[in-house]
Amino acid sequence: MIRATAVRGQHRWTATPADTVVLDFDDRHRRRMAMTGTRGLSFLLDLEQAVALRGGDALVLEDGRLVEVVAAPEPLLEIRGHDPQHLVRLAWHLGNRHLPTQLMAKALRIRRDHVIADMVRGLGGKVVEIEAPFDPEGGAYAPAHDSGEAAHGHHDHAHHDHGHHGHAHHDHGHDHDHAHDHAHGHGCGHDHHGHDHHVHDESCGHQHSHGHSHKHEH
């Protein structure tokens, strides 16, 4: 099986990709993992260390071909405040609980958590359930990744809109807020009682079919 041994950051590649992999936040942070693209290309992700991939990055195959990384939509909470000062206060409370948080100009996004949703409402915030790609802050000590290619830092991303994605079967080798055996598509049941619910993505998107990724070794 051909290997992908390097990563090119978004905006640092222009060639037409040989295939595309659609990955959720967990599966975008792997070192070694068997993957299959949306057009059927199978390969082994085999990096020197785990890299936090972002939508728009490219995996470099041994023969020089590229595989585009697309961030899959996930069940999230979008949080808004009355004004910028209120939103900063809400962000502080999320950070105080060490929750991975995506910072936006007028909103915050976190993984869906009914306990946190109730807390935010108690603080006067508005909470809406959405499905969108999740791109949280990496933290002050998260290194920019190069993995043999040019490094890139945290900046705005061109997300891709998807209605669903395939299963990524694997054992998790690192901690997550909610431990689970496998990531499931968004047709699976989520409890939405007591919440407003709609699906949207503020970023530009184009449709992809969805491939599968299988854990090989972490």
From Swiss-Prot:
GO molecular function, one term: unfolded protein binding
Cross-referenced SUPFAM superfamilies: Urease metallochaperone UreE, C-terminal domain, Urease metallochaperone UreE, N-terminal domain
Subcellular localization, as worded in the UniProt entry: Cytoplasm
CDD domains assigned: UreE
Keyword Cytoplasm: yes
InterPro entries (UniProt xref): UreE, UreE_C_dom, UreE_N, UreE_N_sf
Bias kind Basic residues: ranges: 154-171, 207-218
BP-aspect Gene Ontology terms: protein folding; protein-containing complex assembly; urea metabolic process
Major subcellular site: cytoplasm
GO cellular-component term (any): cytoplasm
Biased composition (Basic and acidic residues): 172-205
Location of the region described as Disordered in the Swiss-Prot/TrEMBL record: 138-218
Record keywords, A-Z: Chaperone, Cytoplasm, Nickel
Entry annotated with the keyword Heme: no
Biological function: Involved in urease metallocenter assembly. Binds nickel. Probably functions as a nickel donor during metallocenter assembly.
Family listed: Belongs to the UreE family.
Protein name: Urease accessory protein UreE
Record organism: Rhodopseudomonas palustris (strain TIE-1)
Lineage: Bacteria, Pseudomonadati, Pseudomonadota, Alphaproteobacteria, Hyphomicrobiales
